[in-house]
């Protein structure tokens, strides 16, 4: 049996391990936070860049000290461009990318159909995030789970 599937039985999600901007491998299972948002995106997309600035950054600033963390998985194929975007936008949450784009195994594993795609781990358990698509719904979700 695949190790990823064995680990999934222990947690209810399949772990991700990818390099960050500095080249260090960061595992999703090692991220600390009461609520961890697994955020699939691509820096190649202008709308995604605006989503980072208009939605994700302000919400992260308000909730990061309350137990909220982000594990952002870029589906870019140009890792240098992705890293530049992360630095230029000052995205100070966890950002990882394997450079394989839509061919990355995590796309299939997490059934990513479109970007942005958001999944949430609450106290280590994967929970439904249906309807979380903008700042108001993200804030509402976090307010309900970060009590």
Where are these regions (language model features)?
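Hydrophobic beta-strand anchors of alpha/beta hydrolase catalytic cores
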Residues: 37-38, 70, 118
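Thiol/disulfide oxidoreductase modules built on the thioredoxin-like
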Residues: 91, 102-143
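Short, contiguous acidic/charged loop-to-helix segments that flank catalytic cores in large enzymes
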Residues: 25-28, 41-50, 70-75, 96-98, ...
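Loop/turn elements at helix/coil->beta-strand transitions in domains of secreted/extracellular proteins
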Residues: 32-35, 65-68, 90-92
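N-proximal helix/coil linker or "cap" segments that precede and/or mark the start of modular domains
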Residues: 1-19, 29-32, 61, 80, ...
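Conserved redox-active cysteine motifs that mediate thiol-disulfide chemistry
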Residues: 33, 37-57
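Structural microenvironment flanking redox-active thiols in thiol-disulfide oxidoreductases
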Residues: 49-88, 102-107
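Short gly/ser/thr-rich secondary-structure transition/capping motifs
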Residues: 17-23, 97-101
